Amino acid sequence: MLDSTNGTGVQGHVEDGWGKVADVFRANFEGTPGEVGAACCVYVDGRPVVDLRGGLADREANRPWNEDTIALVASTTKGATAICAHLLAQRGELDLDAPVVKYWPEFGAAGKEHIPVRWLLSHQAGLPIVDGPLTFEDACAWHPVIRSLEAQKPEWQPGTEHVYHSMTFGFLVGEVVRRITGRSLGTFFADEVAAPLGLSAWIGLPEAQEGRVARIGYAAPFTLEEMTAGMIETTGLDRDTVIAWMNAVWGPDSVQARAGQLGGAFDHTSGYMNTRAFRAAEFPFGNMFSDARSLARMYAATVSEVDGVRLLNPATVEKMTVVHTDKTKMNGLPPGLDVPANRSFYMSLGFWRACPPMPFVGPGSFGHPGSGGSVAFADPDAGVGFGYVTNLWSFRIGEPRASNLAAAVTACLGSRR
């Protein structure tokens, strides 16, 4: 049991040989940006070896981050959504090579009739953008977004390009799950993943859990200038090249900027993420609320048995982690302007694989990060499940808090061999 006296309030459990992770976790509170509140958990071979928490869940209210605190994990949600799809595939209820229209006939409009399910998971469906117009209330209601996706024409020939489907991923995969099971993605996750493992994790937060939620704060405004500065620092490229790349990827008319608006439903300056309406909705692309322990436990159960429960068998893990896209090129970039080598990432069926921006703990690792800093992953070879959550959101590219923790886990694993 740890009980910090350095003002960060770091508490928890660390087994012998895992002290480096605790050292990095404490140091994160003193770095730039310094943590407000956070938690980190590591499972190895189905049991926890690190379970840490510290800081404040709500800086304004001076509320401490305790054992029951949960936080928004943003796109780390996508990993949980993908696990749900692969559970159905493992059970023989979902064929990843079948066209989406087998399960969702209305999806076939506007030239989408041949898109296979796997392209929804690998971000190759050509549907990162919804023309709309949609409102936030439409997104919360689910079906208006589904109707828009049914009518949407792909931005390019499906299967030929990879672009991150930041918002639509959750609606696309979630609707397939709903058509097969008759349950929303959030309900399926609660029944088939969270309940068997005893997780404190929800996609669609029950009102009874509101008092546990950490309040989000920001290390700095989410600006193109901030992201550009981080890119210069982490790539070593000259400013003109970085500005050209960032404008192409994140400028106001770029594919990614339009994708993040979901047809006008999301205004990223409105502070909606701290509202009850956002928390209560089911957004399988990015509004799971969880503690670090649950993230680590969930991923651990994909590669090993956890208290008698294993979610996915080795054959399923092998199939779902095959790299489908090597993101060294990105749709919408000017000719000759590729993704810098140390920013490339590799996407399998719903998961990031180990890559330069997020090496995890080894070449076999798979998982998903989230905007603001959260991350969760597993490593089949090491038997690792890892989860990290924070309420101090930073959009700095190369943001080191989670990657430093993962590096410490890697070092501890190495010392055990």
Give, region by region, the residue ranges found by the protein language model.
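Active-site helix/loop module of the DD-peptidase/beta-lactamase fold
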Residues: 67, 72-76, 90-132, 150-151, ...
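Short, gly/Ser/Thr-rich active-site loops of penicillin-recognizing serine hydrolases
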Residues: 304-307, 316, 321-334, 396-417
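Structured C-terminal helix/loop/strand segments within mature extracytoplasmic catalytic/sensor domains
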Residues: 368-417
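Active-site-proximal alpha-helical segments within enzyme catalytic domains
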Residues: 123, 169-176, 282, 286-308, ...
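Short, conserved catalytic-motif segment at the N-terminal edge
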Residues: 11-73, 95, 151
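Flexible glycine/proline-enriched surface loops and loop-helix/loop-strand junctions
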Residues: 66, 152-159, 169-172, 275-284
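Active-site Gly/Thr loop motif
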Residues: 220-290, 322-381
